Curated annotation (Swiss-Prot):
Disulfide bonds: none annotated. Residues 337-346 have a biased composition (Acidic residues). Seed storage protein. This is Vicilin. Residues 444-459 have a biased composition (Basic and acidic residues). Residues 1-28 form the signal peptide. Residues 238-251 have a biased composition (Low complexity). The keyword Cell wall biogenesis/degradation does not apply.
Amino acid sequence: MAATTMKASFPLLMLMGISFLASVCVSSRSDPQNPFIFKSNKFQTLFENENGHIRLLQKFDQRSKIFENLQNYRLLEYKSKPHTIFLPQHTDADYILVVLSGKAILTVLKPDDRNSFNLERGDTIKLPAGTIAYLVNRDDNEELRVLDLAIPVNRPGQLQSFLLSGNQNQQNYLSGFSKNILEASFNTDYEEIEKVLLEEHEKETQHRRSLKDKRQQSQEENVIVKLSRGQIEELSKNAKSTSKKSVSSESEPFNLRSRGPIYSNEFGKFFEITPEKNPQLQDLDIFVNSVEIKEGSLLLPHYNSRAIVIVTVNEGKGDFELVGQRNENQQEQRKEDDEEEEQGEEEINKQVQNYKAKLSSGDVFVIPAGHPVAVKASSNLDLLGFGINAENNQRNFLAGDEDNVISQIQRPVKELAFPGSAQEVDRILENQKQSHFADAQPQQRERGSRETRDRLSSV
């Protein structure tokens, strides 16, 4: 029985590396039935005004049971226009913040200190839960786009923001304290505290209402606010730039491209910062990577041994294919009282399934541990990935000249595992001269097409 299973599985993985999964699977599922893809419309808008927006991706475990271990991970997107600021707030979640595009000033507050950083594309920093921070788009022309991986510390999957400025939907959290507590805390009359720090909730005079209307007009909903050039210059003072040489700081930003790519050739580049390289990522057990795939190129089939990878399409278009088992997206629980039916369902689920989807900017896809995946770029494709369970993760490639785990199988086992001889298997494995990235158009097909065109032209 075990030998039969081996013979069934190895050829499928083998073919996957050769033919981009086209003939691997018993069946195929595209976008609507694919639990591994989250299109950009799956983001919920938490806040939006003329200066920008904040969006939150739906919960991963709402999509499929296979994402139960992602219950406490959420993905947020921030976008703001030039010369704007996300006003101070803190949340009950650890954050890993990555700049997707634009230029920013991030200010991080501590009880006895304040640090400001100039951030650019690829800059990354961990913000511990409860950190008060504010973010400025310092560029004159380009929008700022930031992606956050949030790990809540109170309730799994539930985020709570605490605003110092307050808005129409949520009060300044200082207003939640009683009058006596506020007066004692600030050693100031409540009327002065209310005027300077809080939204007024008592009946206002016409003069006060006029002042408030002007304030709301200039700071609509007090989350993303316009800044003058002079204010940005003031906030830029003493802001430190990210080091391009080191990724080992415990509190300062690091850039994903601060070290050379771990994989690189003419078809693509793969940058990655792991917990071993950066202390900010160690306690969260997360790696962060950035992948560039050139138009018409392929990130070769591979799988992660332990890590679940959440991937966001930053720029470009492409296709991804993931190999799983049939019915991985079903939510129903099996009935325990029918063992034969359960065994039958398990046998069905062992059939290989091809899950594929078109990719465009803003889409998110998830790669569970052990699931082979390949990504093809129809235009230059830029991807950002967060890897959960990063410690001791091994990325195993299933095709390519280097790091190809299938090529490590001993010849006697190849004879047993594959329909062809070991010599034939080796010949196919050696046909691909590239590693990690390759041309998405097989050379044999190109050669055949060229020969066909030549014959037709001669006729």
